[in-house]
């Protein structure tokens, strides 16, 4: 998907159209894990964000990486955001069943647990209505195409707009 059809670009359009002065800084890296997010979060904080959309973990799940390590990485990112007074919108992810039911259950439980523990605004599943829907994804059934990014943008906006009003 070209940059202007990506969800960060679409989100910027929604923000501007609603009259908010906020600027989206796309710190996402395709294929990245929560460990990569830990390495990048200090750079992100140099932009002095008011709000961080924390949407990491899907690639940890695709690779079958340790759920405990993912949780620890997300906790580190949350702590650093809090040190810089950035509010957080946490987007949940789902795991594929190929690593077994226990892994899937443990993986998916991390996101609501962290949202509750840290009192975060929470979007239960970033790709709701997109993942597994061939008309909204690349042939892998996971990565969104333009129509999928439109859905993702709307999902994020429902949680983000009230945060922008505060």
PLM segments and residue spans:
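Glycine- and acidic-residue-enriched helix-capping/strand-helix junction motifs
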Residues: 1-7
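A short beta-strand-loop structural module common to alpha/beta enzyme folds
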Residues: 20-33
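Short, surface-exposed alpha-helical recognition segments that flank or form part
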Residues: 2, 29-32, 65, 144
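Alpha-helical cap/lid subdomain in secreted, periplasmic
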Residues: 9-20, 36-166
């Amino acid at each position: 998907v070209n940059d202007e059809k990506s969800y960060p670009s679409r989100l910027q359009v929604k923000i501007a159209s609603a009259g908010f002065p906020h600027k989206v800084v796309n710190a996402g890296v395709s294929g990245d894990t929560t460990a990569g997010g830990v390495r990048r979060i200090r750079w992100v904080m140099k932009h002095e964000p008011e709000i961080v959309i924390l949407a990491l973990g899907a690639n940890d799940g695709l690779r079958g990486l340790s759920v405990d390590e993912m949780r620890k990485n997300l906790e580190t990112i949350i702590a650093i955001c809090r040190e810089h007074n950035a509010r957080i919108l946490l987007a949940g992810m789902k795991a594929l069943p190929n690593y077994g039911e226990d892994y899937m259950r443990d993986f998916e439980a991390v996101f609501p647990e962290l949202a509750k523990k840290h009192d975060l605004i929470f979007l239960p599943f970033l790709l709701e209505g997109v993942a597994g829907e061939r008309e909204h994804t690349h042939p892998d059934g996971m990565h969104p195409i333009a129509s999928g990014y439109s859905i993702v943008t709307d999902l994020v906006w429902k949680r983000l707009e009230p945060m922008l009003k505060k």
